[in-house]
């Protein structure tokens, strides 16, 4: 991964990411590097340009730890993991969920508190459902959010390497 401080890169929490193909297309259009981070091997299409695969081993949070460690201003982190989103925001990264939700410093506290409350209720047997199924509108919202994040970073002085 190019680690120049003024360049844009995309870091993907890839194990269960449903929008990897969209990330590859957007990154190619903007000539941006992508780092796919996973706990196991993830196939990358041959035509995907500038995509690096990082397979971490060890504990369940190893991929999250790697992404948090490499998060920085100019990085766009794609994750559905709320605690990882919080850690990446602390490092100055832009964070987008696969459903297109943009996490910010001003919203992540409430999102994290809600997640923790639902986890507690689920542990107590009060909540049995999970998130809504991934839908085409989520894919569209994600593409818009990713393009917006890249445009904002370019306007802020970051560039493709």
UniProtKB/Swiss-Prot annotation:
InterPro entries: UPF0178. CDD domains: PIN_YqxD-like. It holds the Pfam family DUF188. It comes from the Bacteria. Belongs to the UPF0178 family. PANTHER family: UPF0178 PROTEIN YAII (PTHR35146:SF1). This is UPF0178 protein BCAN_A2024.
